[in-house]
């Protein structure tokens, strides 16, 4: 059985111990259920930059890649690029992750550029965001500019590309290791190429580099008859644990994982299957534990606009997508904050996401957060929490599917590995 307790320091109080295994079992299927009940299964230990365990933290801090959570002081970050953003072909996995009012858009423009004027404005917004990050003392890295309109073909499928806008989707930093995710969309099969020059440089300078097993993305990975006509259909299917991705082979987006020191929280979604989560669990054990949490969400794809851990014992929980295990966090002494309703207008295009990008924020440290300049309600929420807001307008960038957390991958945060749950 999986035991969880929160180690809380300072004014946050004493330890609290809670058992969660029985509450998670219903989320598991088949052998995945049995495997997750044991924390002693086969594991691959994380290797520090220096072999001597006594200097582990020091060695990790000397690596160019080092990040254990979502809130330690940010020193270096990758920011995505909107350049050449291409509409993905309207395949079954894209349909399962988008809202029906945009389906005609995908049917008409799949394989073509997103609206050029919109992308141009998004580029300007992200450039301004980079300037602000640099002003705040953060080193900013960017992926390569690539032509995503080129058609490619594998033995199993053919597609055009999409973009390198959301590094959070493809890269996950755990300690001194950078992990390339085996994403589930065919249009994102070669997205890693935009980041390889950066990753190779980090590797040469001492970081650990892992590429998860690349999926074939054969037809068997997808339920070709996934019965979606409306969001209500998806809600019912997700509630029954039915998703467009099957368990044919491991797949996951890095953005379906949320880090809190030694504990990492993941969700089964339309792009992340149990095999993918199991691969991560084995790969990161025994130094890290991966826990599955679930939500009342008709369109689960990425955890960070649903459940965003912004500090030790502090989490934003989407009121429209309540976490089924939220009482575990409350009983452990965590502060659960419900963010206000987003202010983004109904007529603003959001081709790949919901309005809840308002809570998809980037923590620069425990007391500074980068947040959308237009979301005045959430500014007030952070002020009440004693967190200063750094306001940047990225509304046009939002349309491409992400907020500040999505548009970034924190490469280096100044901190050490700690336990917040055990």
Curated annotation (Swiss-Prot):
Pathway terms, separated by semicolons: Amine and polyamine biosynthesis; creatine biosynthesis; creatine from L-arginine and glycine: step 1/2
Q: Where are the transmembrane segments?
A: none
Taxonomic superkingdom: Eukaryota
Q: What is its EC number?
A: 2.1.4.1
Presequence extent in this chain: 1-37
**Subunit notes for this chain?**
Homodimer.
**Could you say which protein family the record assigns here?**
Belongs to the amidinotransferase family.
Q: What does this protein do?
A: Catalyzes the biosynthesis of guanidinoacetate, the immediate precursor of creatine. Creatine plays a vital role in energy metabolism in muscle tissues. May play a role in embryonic and central nervous system development.
Q: What protein am I looking at?
A: Glycine amidinotransferase, mitochondrial
Q: What is the lineage of its organism?
A: Eukaryota, Metazoa, Chordata, Craniata, Vertebrata
């Amino acid at each position: 059985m999986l035991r969880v307790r929160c180690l809380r320091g300072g004014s946050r109080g004493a330890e609290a111990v809670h058992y969660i295994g029985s509450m998670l079992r219903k989320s598991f299927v088949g052998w995945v259920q049995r495997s997750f009940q044991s924390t002693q299964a086969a594991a691959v230990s994380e290797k520090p930059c220096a072999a001597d365990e006594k200097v582990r933290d020091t060695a990790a801090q000397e690596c160019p890649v080092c990040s254990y959570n979502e809130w330690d002081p940010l020193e270096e970050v990758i920011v995505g690029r909107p350049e050449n953003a291409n509409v993905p072909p309207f395949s079954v996995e894209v349909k399962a992750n988008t809202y029906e009012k945009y389906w005609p858009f995908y049917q008409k423009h799949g394989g073509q550029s997103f609206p050029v004027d919109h992308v141009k404005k998004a580029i300007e917004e992200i450039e301004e965001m980079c300037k602000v990050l640099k002003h705040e003392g953060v080193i900013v890295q960017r992926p390569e500019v690539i032509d995503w309109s080129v058609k490619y073909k594998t033995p199993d499928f053919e597609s055009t590309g999409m973009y390198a806008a959301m590094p959070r989707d493809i890269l996950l930093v755990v300690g001194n290791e950078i992990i390339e995710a085996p994403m589930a969309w065919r249009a994102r099969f070669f997205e890693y190429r935009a980041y390889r020059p950066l990753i190779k440089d980090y590797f040469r300078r001492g970081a650990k580099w892992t590429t998860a097993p690349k999926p074939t993305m054969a037809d068997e990975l997808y339920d070709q008859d996934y019965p979606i006509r409306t969001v209500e259909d998806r809600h019912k299917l997700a509630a029954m644990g039915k998703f467009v991705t099957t368990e044919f082979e491991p797949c996951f987006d890095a953005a379906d994982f949320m880090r809190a020191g030694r504990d990492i929280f993941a969700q089964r979604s339309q792009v992340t299957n149990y095999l993918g989560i199991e691969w991560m669990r084995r790969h990161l054990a025994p130094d890290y534990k991966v826990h599955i949490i679930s939500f009342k969400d008709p369109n689960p794809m990425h955890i960070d606009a649903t459940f965003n851990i912004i500090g030790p014992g502090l989490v934003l929980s989407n009121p429209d997508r309540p976490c089924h295990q939220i009482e575990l966090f409350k009983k452990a002494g965590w502060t659960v904050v419900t963010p206000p309703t987003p202010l983004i207008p109904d007529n603003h295009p959001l081709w790949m996401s919901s309005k809840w990008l308002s809570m998809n924020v980037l923590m620069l440290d425990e007391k500074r957060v980068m947040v959308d300049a237009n979301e005045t309600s959430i500014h007030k929420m952070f002020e009440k929490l004693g967190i200063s807001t750094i306001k940047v307008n990225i509304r046009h960038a939002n349309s491409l599917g992400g907020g500040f957390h999505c548009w970034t991958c924190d490469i280096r945060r100044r901190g050490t590995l700690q336990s917040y749950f055990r």
